Amino acid sequence: MSGIFRFSGDEDCLLGGSMYLSPGSCPGVYYPARKRLRVAATSFYSGFEEKQTSIDVLPEECLFEILRRLPSGQERSACACVSKHWLNLLSSISRSEVNESSVQDVEEGEGFLSRSLEGKKATDLRLAAIAVGTSSRGGLGKLQIRGSGFESKVTDVGLGAVAHGCPSLRIVSLWNLPAVSDLGLSEIARSCPMIEKLDLSRCPGITDSGLVAIAENCVNLSDLTIDSCSGVGNEGLRAIARRCVNLRSISIRSCPRIGDQGVAFLLAQAGSYLTKVKLQMLNVSGLSLAVIGHYGAAVTDLVLHGLQGVNEKGFWVMGNAKGLKKLKSLSVMSCRGMTDVGLEAVGNGCPDLKHVSLNKCLLVSGKGLVALAKSALSLESLKLEECHRINQFGLMGFLMNCGSKLKAFSLANCLGISDFNSESSLPSPSCSSLRSLSIRCCPGFGDASLAFLGKFCHQLQDVELCGLNGVTDAGVRELLQSNNVGLVKVNLSECINVSDNTVSAISVCHGRTLESLNLDGCKNITNASLVAVAKNCYSVNDLDISNTLVSDHGIKALASSPNHLNLQVLSIGGCSSITDKSKACIQKLGRTLLGLNIQRCGRISSSTVDTLLENLWRCDILY
C-alpha cells in the first residue's frame, strides 16, 4: 500500500493507487527530473516522535506528592517498576515523609530480612530496589555489600536510598567500596539508629566524620570492625569510645592513621565493658598494650597480629598490670615483642587464661612454654605455628608441667623440633586430660617423638598427624597402644610411610568409636585398609582415601560391609585404580552419602558420573 504524506508531517495518507507512475514501472519512457521537496528532515520525522506520557509532564514535586500518598507497600513496589526515575524518586522518600493518614503498613518492621550484593550486582539501582521492596515485607535487618574495587557502582546515593527505606537496619557490612564516603555513612547513621553491628572494609572515602556520625546516632552499636580504611584515625575511635557504651567487640586492621592515642583512649574509656579486642597491623607501641593490661577488666578475647612496634616491655607490662583478670583467649601472630619473658608475664597476670595461640613468634622458646605451663593453671589449649625456636625438649617440658586441664595441643610448621634419641631414657608422667593432639608439617618429628607422647597421653580422642615423613607404623602404634578410650577422629594425611598395618590396628582397637578417618596422600594404603574398615568399624561416617592405591575391590568391600556402614562423606579423588566397575557399589553407599569426591579419577567415565548425579540427587558430588 502506498501513500503520500502531507508536508505538515501528519501520518494521514491517501488510500488506493498512486497518483503518479513510478519511474521504474515503465522502462523506456522519459521522465523529467523532479524538483527536490523543500521539507526539513526534522519536520518530516516529527510525526514519528512519541508523545510524552502525561504523568511525566508533571513537575517532580507533584509526582513526589503522589507517590508518597500511595496506600500500601505493594503499590509502591509496583510503581517502582515503572521506570528508573520513579524507582529513584520512591527510594528518596523517607518514612517521615510518607503520608501516614493513607498508609497502613509503615510501622517499624522487625528487621528480619537479609540482603547481600556482590561484585557487579552491587549497584545503586539494586540498593534502591531493596529499599523500596523490603519496607513492607518485615523490614531489612541485615545488609552486606561486597564491591569490586574501583569498578564498584555503589555510591552515597545507594546508601541514602537504603537509609530512607530501611530504618530497622541492624547489621551493615560495606566491603571494598571506594566511591562511598562519609555522606552515605552519615545518612545510614541518622536514619538507622538501631544499628548494632558495623563492618567497614577497604572504604578509603570514609573518615573520622563518618564514625562520629555513627557514634552520635547509633548508641546500640555493639560490634565494630574497621579494616583497611585509610581515612579513619584516632578522632573516630575517641568518638566511638565516648558515645557507644554498648560496644562489646572491636576489630581494627591496617589503618595507618590509627595509633597509640586512639587505641589507648578507646581501651581506657571502654575497657570496663569491651569483651573482644582485635588489633592487627597497626602503628602502635607498648603503650597500647600497657593500657589494655591496666584497663581491660572485661576483655575475654584478645588478638594481637602484626604489631611490629611493640617490644618485649609492652607484653611484660600488659601481663604484670594484672588487669586482664577475665582474659580467656589470647592469639599473638608476627609480634617481635612476644618473647619468653612476655609469655611468662601474660601467664602470671591472666589467671583465667584457657586458650593460647602463638604464630610466627620467632623469639619464643621452650623456656617460655615451661613458664606458661607453670603459671597458666587453667590452660586448656595451646596452638604453636612457625615458632622455630621451640625444640623437642621444650615440648617435653611443657607437657610435663602443664596443668590437669589441658585438652588440646597443636604443633604446626615448627622446624626446631627434632626426633628424640631412641636410646635415651624419657620420663613417663601422665597427661590424662589431653583429648586432641595435632602435629602438622614438622619435618624432624618421628617415631621416637610419638612414643614419647604415647607415654603422656592415654585419653586421646582426636589425633592429627599430617605431612610427617618420619612417622611409620611403629610410631603410630606406640602412640595408640596405650590409649584407654576410643579414638573418634584420626587424620594421617600425607604420611607417606604409614601402611595398611596402621589402619588395621586402628580399626581393630577403635572400630566401635571411630567416626572420621583421613588417609589422603598415604601412598602405601591399599584395599586391605578398606577391608579392615569394612570389617571392624561400626560408626565411621567420614572416610577420605584420596590419592591412595585403593581400587574397585576396596570400594566393593565397603559396600558389602557386614556392619552396614553409615557413610556420609566419601572422598576417593585421585584414585586412578577406581573405574566404572565401582558404579553399583558407589550407588549402594550413596543411600546415606551427603558428600562424594570423585575428582581426578581418570578411569571413571562421564557416563558414570552422569548416572551418579542422577541417582544420588541428595548427595553433593565433586567431579
UniProtKB/Swiss-Prot annotation:
Give expression by tissue: Ubiquitous.
* Source species, domain of life: Eukaryota
Q: What induces it?
A: EIN3-dependent induction by ethylene.
- Gene Ontology BP terms: ethylene-activated signaling pathway; negative regulation of ethylene-activated signaling pathway; protein ubiquitination; response to ethylene; ubiquitin-dependent protein catabolic process
Q: Which GO terms describe its cellular component?
A: nucleus; SCF ubiquitin ligase complex
Keyword annotations: Ethylene signaling pathway, Leucine-rich repeat, Nucleus, Repeat, Ubl conjugation pathway
| Leader sequence segment | none
Q: Where is the F-box domain?
A: 52-106
Query: Annotated pathway, please?
Result: Protein modification; protein ubiquitination
The record's listing under InterPro entries reads: F-box-like_dom_sf, F-box_dom, Leu-rich_rpt, Leu-rich_rpt_Cys-con_subtyp, LRR_dom_sf
Where are LRR repeat segments found?
A: 119-147, 151-176, 177-202, 203-228, 229-254, 255-281, 307-334, 335-360, 361-386, 387-413, 414-441, 442-467, 468-494, 495-521, 522-547, 548-574, 575-600, 601-623
Question: Where does it live in the cell?
Answer: Nucleus
Q: What does this protein do?
A: Component of SCF(EBF1) E3 ubiquitin ligase complexes, which may mediate the ubiquitination and subsequent proteasomal degradation of target proteins (probably including EIN3 and EIL1). Regulator of the ethylene signaling cascade by modulating the stability of EIN3 and EIL1 proteins.
Instruction: Fetch the PANTHER family from UniProt.
Output: EIN3-BINDING F-BOX PROTEIN 2, PARTNER OF PAIRED, ISOFORM B-RELATED
State the oligomer form and interacting partners: Part of a SCF (SKP1-cullin-F-box) protein ligase complex. Interacts with CUL1, SKP1A/ASK1, SKP1B/ASK2, EIN3, and EIL1.
Protein name (database record): EIN3-binding F-box protein 2
- Record organism: Arabidopsis thaliana
Gene from which the chain derives: EBF2
